[in-house]
Amino acid sequence: MSDSKYFQTTKKGEIHELKEELLSQREDKKKEAVKKVIAAMTVGKDVSMLFTHVLNCMQTHNLELKKLVYLYVMNYAKNHPDRAILAVNTFQKDASDPNPLIRALAVRTMGCIRVDNITEHLCEPLRHALKDQDPYVRKTAAVCVAKLYDVNPELVENQGFLNILNDLLGDSNPMVVANAVASLTEIDEVSKKEVFRIHSGNLNKLLAALNECTEWGQVFILNSLCKYTPRDSQEAENVCERVAPRLQHANSAVVLSAVKVLMKYMNSIGNNDVIRLFCKKMAPPLVTLLSKEPEIQFLGLRNINLIVQKRPEILQYEMKVFFCKYNDPIYVKMEKLEIMIMLANEKNIEEVLLEFKEYATEIDVEFVRKAVRAIGRCAIKIDRASERCIQVLLDLIQTKVNYVVQEAIIVIKDIFRKYPNKYEGIIATLCANLESLDEPEAKASMIWIIGEYAERIDNAHELLNSFLEGFKDENSQVQLQLLTSIVKLFLKRPKDAQQMVQTVLNLSTQESDNPDLRDRGFVYWRLLSTDFEAAKAVVLSEKPLITDTTSHLDESLLNELILNISTLASVYHKPPETFVTKLKGLNKRGLRNKEEEDEEEPDYVDDDNMNNQQGGQQQQGGYQQQQQQQQQGGYQQQQPQQQQPKSGNLIDLDLSDLGGALPNNNNNNYGNNNNNNMYSPQPQQFNGNSNDLSFLGGGGGGGEVQAPVNKVVVFGGDRSQAIQISGAFTRFQGRINLELNLLNTSQQGMSKFKIQFYQNSFGISPADQILSCGAIEVGQSTDVTIPISCNGQISNPLNPVIDMAMMVLPSQERFYFKMNFPLLCLLTETGRLDRESYLSMWKSIPESNERSVEIQVRLPHVDVDSILRRLNSKNIFEIVRKKAPNQEISFLSCKTESSVYILIELAFNISTNTCRCSSKTTSPDIMALFEHNLNLLINNQI
């Protein structure tokens, strides 16, 4: 009879009977009883009261019974650590048993029991097991070290287990080597210092073990080889030759791991013929992945996507294997389309377009859209194929299938941008399908085409006017594009669009709740009212040509993902530390010993820049405007306030989003962030019946104005709740605020609100729990600013998430939600140090508190001045700067509300678009979060 019988009894008094059976002198009865206990435990019954009785069964030579008892102990030891200690003597005795299976079982079980009391007694048995004569015991003990490190890292380091593990890399048994590699790799990923380093001494040992260990052991060893950088081209070639046979393995994981090693080592090979040889060897196993189950196909395709971006020559002749089959799942088809676009070239474009055209007639709407868009991407990628792509798109438009037509128009808009004034002859065909457009992106694309080529479309004003009639009901994307296109039409044909432009500007600035639309409306308003020719120069300027977007990963990220082939990172196309909790903030290794250069005079000091940073300079109508007050040390003296520009000055408007820009005359001072957002100025009152635009006078900037706040929906996003809450934390004029927008989605009005913060890492709470806002009627919303109190103390573990509750009074109805608190809000306006104080403080902070991390600057070019202005706007102040060829080094300081200083050195490498950030602080626990925010600031993402 099978073991299923143990799951079928549920009678009263069962526990008592089990106790009796566990006390039996017969081993077969004990074994049956323990099986029943395990079965009850498996289905969720509490059998912890039998702990002592089961523990007594450990004293046996029956291996099956011992395994069952160990399983029970592992399950309940965490909840009963005081009882688990009773098993230590038996574990230690079993760890020295003559039977290697029992020795290994004892060590494995002790490693799985995550209780401090047990781990203290594990050290000696583990040390003996690591040096055991039997390889089975050694390989089990190697894995146990990683488990022990997860519970108590210091214990593992102090006991010297890491050194023993490194010695096991030279073990005669390949499985011991593989397990030692796996254990060291896992420890190295979460350790703050390097514990696993491959060098020429152990490289050959790993390669020798590669041929003899199991398939998963091969995966561990292959992955570890990616940590090694070959000394020269010959060594890289030798390693590739040893790894290449693994490409023929039946296990897909082994194949992908071998591909990963080859992809890395080929970068070090100087002989192009050898590289071509290895590329040729990699193609068949990658193609074989596409003949496996759909799930493995998908994983293979995601990895192939990265490989093709890095080395397209590997699969350049394998286009046909990526053609979609009728029975492929949709997720496989989508990935195949991406790779087909990457591999498309002038030689194969004809057959690729025939495939895409065929896909565009299928039933699945999303797949059809992707296929149509793929045709457009091929047109942008391959200049000589653009005309053929246009013809295919026109053929698809003739099918009159609604979603095909709309997607084709979206794609043709991009082709027009890539090839201006080349295919305008098809505009009439596009306009004939105007009435079938119902999707926002398709409408916006058609409106863009009409506005861009308004001078060639006789009835352009009529077409745009038809969209203007339903302006208020349109999507914001359509509204923004319609506004821009009508302004373009007015600049090209003023007589036809004069009334229209007045109407659209009025709708955008006076009757819209969309801040983006209002901002753009005010920009156009002032341009048109100030200088017609200047407006034409800006709005109708020559636009940059769009480029091929097939390779959407920047090179640094791609190189990192190549080293993570066959892992989850290669599927997500994200670095591991972005989604693996243990790795977040732990890639900050490589702490360098700071040279004595800090004691020397800097090579270059920008005195003008230092002076411009002094005092509180008046900010003018821009994003992130703040006055600098209460400066320290040599920065007490204030500069005179800069002269404000005249109202309506076109030169000061940031119009880069409109496709054109005029020279910027603003002084390049960090204290003066002229990133004007058109929120502070308000238009003058006008007579709506006026037929000219003289009423569009520009307003002048006033005092310090808070930037518009980008609120995020944090509760009730689907409007299924009684209220929708959007919000964001801000810092303005030295105060932390919580900006909320409350939307009443219930069936009755709301009059009074109360907010509560639960205990959090930053010690923040609302200054007044009762919100100062009026009643909110059904369907209405209101904005409210909540001053935040901060006790200044940051507690550990640091968690940026704040738990909150909103209460509606007097009904007492509560709504619970969470918000992320940005650490930058804690940085005060008094965080600037003078140079002497900076050097003195740097030396006083222990070297152990120094951190170093390399930040990839994902901007078109490294504009150090612009980056430092952004940092200054967030109260991260530059002290001094040093310049060298292709490098600029800036020293900065900032201070939190709790008076914790953070000292930073940013070394910008202009040639590699990187920034090395070294920092010191007396509170290192906050640095992982601070470095994350610094990365976003440098890359202009916040």
Swiss-Prot record:
Residues 678-693 have a biased composition (Polar residues). One of its GO terms (biological process) is mitotic cytokinesis. One of its GO terms (cellular component) is AP-1 adaptor complex. Residues 590-700 are annotated as: Disordered. It is found in: Golgi apparatus, trans-Golgi network; Cytoplasmic vesicle, Clathrin-coated vesicle membrane. Residues 596-609 have a biased composition (Acidic residues). It holds the Pfam family B2-adapt-app_C. Residues 613-645, 664-677 have a biased composition (Low complexity). SUPFAM superfamilies: ARM repeat, Clathrin adaptor appendage domain, Subdomain of clathrin and coatomer appendage domain. InterPro entries: AP_beta, AP_complex_bsu_1_2_4, ARM-like, ARM-type_fold, B-adaptin_app_sub_C, Clathrin/coatomer_adapt-like_N, Clathrin_a/b/g-adaptin_app_Ig, Clathrin_app_Ig-like_sf. It comes from the Eukaryota. GO terms for molecular function: clathrin binding. Keywords: Cytoplasmic vesicle, Golgi apparatus, Membrane, Protein transport, Repeat, Transport. HEAT repeats lie at residues 45-82, 117-154, 156-193, 273-313, 384-421, 458-495. Transmembrane segments: none annotated. Belongs to the adaptor complexes large subunit family. Subunit of clathrin-associated adaptor protein complex 1 that plays a role in protein sorting in the trans-Golgi network (TGN) and endosomes. The AP complexes mediate the recruitment of clathrin to membranes and the recognition of sorting signals within the cytosolic tails of transmembrane cargo molecules. Also involved in early steps of phagocytosis and macropinocytosis. Adaptor protein complex 1 (AP-1) is a heterotetramer composed of two large adaptins (gamma-type subunit and beta-type subunit), a medium adaptin (mu-type subunit) and a small adaptin (sigma-type subunit). This is AP-1 complex subunit beta. It comes from Dictyostelium discoideum (Social amoeba). The gene is ap1b1.
